[in-house]
Amino acid sequence: MAAGSITTLPTESEDGGNTPFSPGSFKDPKRLYCKNGGFFLRINSDGRVDGSRDKSDSHIKLQLQAVERGVVSIKGITANRYLAMKEDGRLTSLRCITDECFFFERLEANNYNTYRSRKYSSWYVALKRTGQYKNGSSTGPGQKAILFLPMSAKS
């Protein structure tokens, strides 16, 4: 490469397949690993939300969708339900998306993400050490229960 030249990356490989830089790859399914207890956030088909340590549990595969800058919805792929925080702080899941299904996603200094309710703005998505969800009214900055590491859920 000569000094001052510009190189562009192709969007397709020569054989027509996708490259690692293909558009839409950010939409790959994720697992949200909680620092508190080592559980993955699970959205069950019956609407319950809890944690599971079983990496093969299909209910931990989640679709995070940006709805605006810094705001995401979290959908359980197998359950086909959206994570929601109710007015009493309970975590549940809903078949149809509502204003209770949007969360501020923030990358913290320790490289974990937090998910804070947009509607109930001082409450966070959190899991207890037992794998049960933690009520939003009992959450706050600095707690291990609110820290999640997004991991690939492909395959």
From Swiss-Prot:
Gene3D superfamilies cross-referenced by the UniProt entry: 2.80.10.50
Which cysteines are cross-linked by disulfides? none
Instruction: Kindly list the GO CC terms recorded for this protein.
Output: cytoplasm; extracellular space; nucleus
Site Important for interaction with integrin — annotated at: 128-129, 134
Coiled-coil region:
none
Q: Which InterPro entries does the entry link to?
A: Fibroblast_GF_fam, IL1/FGF
Show the GO MF annotations: fibroblast growth factor receptor binding; growth factor activity; heparin binding; integrin binding
Q: Family, per the entry? A: Belongs to the heparin-binding growth factors family.
Q: What is this protein called?
A: Fibroblast growth factor 2
Q: Which organism is it from?
A: Xenopus laevis (African clawed frog)
